[in-house]
Amino acid sequence: MQTKLDTKKIITIVAIFLGTVLLLSLIPIIISSFYSHPLADDFGFSEKVNHVVKNGGGLFDILSASFQQVKDTYLDWQGTYAAIFVFSLQPAAFSEHIYFLTTFVMLTALIASTLFFVNTIFNILGYDKKIGIIISFVILLLSIHFVVDKKEAFFWWNGSSYYTLFYSFSLLFFSILIKLYYAEKIIKKVIFLIISLLLAAILGGGNYSTALLTTVILAFVIFLLIKHKKKISLCYVMIFLILITGFVISMIAPGNSVRAATLTGESPVKAIIHSVFYAVVYIAKWTGLA
């Protein structure tokens, strides 16, 4: 009994220690955020919203401007509709003085989604939640402080929302899918299904890396459930269809062809080979193996 109590105390102390280290390590990042400012694509994607704000438009006008930006960009530049919507609402569109919120939004999304994802897994497995918190803190320390380009990960709205925010959405998405699978009450199933469908539509229209990986993982999970004859409800099929539909809508955008025409093309096979090659190169480079 005494040994168990000692172990629990140690786990609690470690969790508090790592949590404190994480919070203290965020201070320089938060201070730096007050010196950040909009750059490049921030201006182009938020021009319509900024125009509405300057002319005293209300919430409906702002949302209309955002959707118009999505439509225009979808037709003439890129198809990632959900990402473009987020781009159009960058903080400086309302005031350059609040651009620092970029860092707060990204850190909050990353921290909350990581904690939620790990906690969801530990709840299902029946493990000590404090150990899950410790693992979450370790993941966050590594994710935040060893990211290759901090300015694009946490300080630049266009870049950080495209990757950090949508990565956070994917963690939330898989967390909700797990909860949906194990939910017993109808009301919980309905709530989790609605959230999952919404996130599927958002992720399908996000950056292509996250959209593709999320689609592949979900397809693989469904395959495993079928293979092992586990219960698979119509809910998962609906979610997958929404995800893949959003992804396809994003890929077939006329704007993608317009943008591709400005670049030197290569065959699909060559593109895949280059993707795999540079994935290995950058993994080695970013992990210090090369």
PLM regions with names:
Residues I191-Y208:
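Membrane-interface alpha helices of multi-pass inner-membrane proteins
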Residues M1-I27:
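Start-transfer (signal-anchor) and selected internal transmembrane alpha helices
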Residues S33-A93, I98-F100, Y208-A290:
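Transmembrane catalytic cores of multi-pass membrane glycosyltransferases
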